[in-house]
A protein has these predicted regions:
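Primarily marks secretory-pathway-exposed extracellular/lumenal segments that are disulfide-
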Residues: 4-8, 14-50, 57, 63, ...
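Conserved beta-hairpin
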Residues: 70-78
């Protein structure tokens, strides 16, 4: 009888443990059978993102832009458009991006720039890799790991999905 009670108690304890995983339906690894979120949710970087904070080499330069948007497309291409404050021409960049499987590093390879000055697209190859500090369905927060851009040692970006 004592063994039966212990056995039944064990079943109740084990049965009450919920399945852990990602229970956010907005995540790309959502599992509807999960009852306890374990912090492993992964979110898509695809879509339109708007700049909230841009810190370059320790200086907050967010206010130097009237607009700053990046569009991540499902073919791993991106388009970045920004309008410097007081300017009338957007500067457009395009290229490809790679987000690693664990969503911890995001690499951009710029292929072209257009200053919208009548000269069209000009080839420019620049590679920048960022550490993804946070990626949710609403926020992308990243810090520069490496770049080909001379004289740039640190970048912190916070973007909001629009």
């Amino acid at each position: 009888m004592k063994k039966l009670i212990i056995f039944m108690f064990s079943i109740v304890l084990l049965g009450s443990c919920g399945k852990e995983g990602c229970n956010d339906p907005d995540a790309i690894n959502y599992d509807s059978s999960v009852t306890k979120d374990d912090g492993t949710c992964l979110y898509s970087v695809l879509g339109n993102w708007e700049l909230q904070t841009y810190i370059l080499d320790g200086d907050d330069i967010t206010s130097t832009f009237s607009d700053y948007f990046i569009y991540h497309f499902d073919d791993s291409s991106y388009s970045l458009a920004y309008l410097p404050l007081g300017d009338s021409n957007y500067i457009d960049l395009r290229g490809t991006f790679t987000l690693n499987d664990s969503h911890t590093e995001l690499t951009y390879e710029n292929t072209d720039v257009n200053y919208n000055d009548g000269n069209g697209w000009t080839p420019v190859i620049v590679t920048s890799t960022y550490s993804v500090n946070a990626l949710t369905n609403e926020t992308l927060n990243m810090s520069l790991i490496s770049t080909d851009v001379p004289n740039v040692s640190s970048v912190e970006l916070i973007m909001s999905k629009i």
